[in-house]
């Protein structure tokens, strides 16, 4: 699944019936959200609104609205192939030298992919075909969506924010929502543990009073966007990972007003700075939990330059109660997580983040249990191994005879293999999602682990129940005569 940029990818989608062009005028204020939401819930195509009311720039929505399109964005044909992406990430996270010639031969595809890791810097780029600066900067010319009736203001949702800390060689790419508050002002909502916020904190400590350079790319190629939301090892840049996914080096260009590098093929780039100490109240906004979040203060991003392609496309989305686009992304990226976890915990058979659990707040893990207390070790491992699971409130651990993706199986295991007092683990005062208003303190809450495995000696003193199993000979015999029985046919059985 080869493509060079977002437009290339849209052409591929259109050829496969995965893109619908909407020529009817539609308002970015609430109407696009309503159409995109109905389309996503029906498993429909990506949507390109060619005539948003009041604007000359088209709006792209629902790009990653199905797991298949997420897989395509990662250079794969289908979701099942994303396990291979996870295996590659697991290898890069903890690379092992070849153990011999045969092992070297087996690892050659991985080593070959690594050759696509370095970025390629261009002198000129499509994203700088048109440039406005100073008083000519006007974010109101971009069809920024207002998604829900009580949202505070139009909101940029798919902005790829590029930052660099004062002591770091490589840049950080993150996706943070940005509230429009003026023709050249946005509120940068990044949580304190996120890469961009950490870069900013380090900058303030190293350069008191100096402006912090920031650039935001809109409409980057899908591999680069997905690289920013994937559990990339800390030693690997998101641009490098995008090159691995795409099979070609990521092309970047230096910004006009700062030294940051942005995707050369991005549709729009916002360049500017954060003035230390300048903050503004952000929100409320409807978010992925299905609720409006609290108002809180975040840094203000001042835009000094807007560069863009000719006939630029504005890429956007909405977030709300699942299913939404982030939930679909979570379903697809779930397949990437499994091999990474299995690399650290080989006993893990499957790992599932149900989308109805806001994509990350609840996890179901199945394991090949090997000793008493094993389930609790896995719980602690899930919470601590990848930062993506820092906010996972509930971890349910089951044996490998349970299908982690079937609630009927999981609920059966919980209700038959758990004693609430013995098999529930509660951990207090842990990092929790700022948007989780159920926690007693903003950003700090508790976690619960549920051990729904069969109990081993040492975990119980009682004789453990034996699951009912059918007689295989009887099953085979009934299979052979099933059609003759005609139970579900109108005709009579023989």
From Swiss-Prot:
For this protein, what reaction is catalysed? a 4-hydroxy-3-(all-trans-polyprenyl)benzoate + H(+) = a 2-(all-trans-polyprenyl)phenol + CO2
Q: Name one GO biological process term.
A: ubiquinone biosynthetic process
Q: Name one GO molecular function term.
A: 3-octaprenyl-4-hydroxybenzoate carboxy-lyase activity
Q: Which cellular component, as a GO term, is one annotated location?
A: plasma membrane
Membrane topology value: Peripheral membrane protein
Q: Which InterPro entries match?
A: UbiD, UbiD-like_C, UbiD-like_N, UbiD_bacteria, UbiD_Rift_dom
Its localization reads: Cell membrane
Binding residues annotated for Mn(2+), in chain numbering: 172, 238
Keyword Membrane carried by entry: yes
- Record-linked Pfam families: UbiD (PF01977), UbiD_C (PF20696), UbiD_N (PF20695)
Does the entry feature the keyword Metal-binding, yes or no? yes
Q: Which domain of life is it from?
A: Bacteria
Provide the alphabetized UniProt keywords.
Cell membrane, Decarboxylase, Flavoprotein, FMN, Lyase, Manganese, Membrane, Metal-binding, Ubiquinone biosynthesis
Give the enzyme's EC designation: 4.1.1.98
Q: How is the cofactor bound, as the UniProt entry phrases it?
A: Binds 1 prenylated FMN per subunit.
Names of required cofactors: prenylated FMN; Mn(2+)
Instruction: Using the UniProt record, name the top-level EC class of this enzyme in a single word.
Output: lyase
HAMAP family (UniProt xref): UbiD (MF_01636)
Q: What does this protein do?
A: Catalyzes the decarboxylation of 3-octaprenyl-4-hydroxy benzoate to 2-octaprenylphenol, an intermediate step in ubiquinone biosynthesis.
Subunit details: Homohexamer.
Q: What is this protein called?
A: 3-octaprenyl-4-hydroxybenzoate carboxy-lyase
Q: Native species of this protein?
A: Escherichia coli O1:K1 / APEC
Upper classification of the organism: Bacteria, Pseudomonadati, Pseudomonadota, Gammaproteobacteria, Enterobacterales
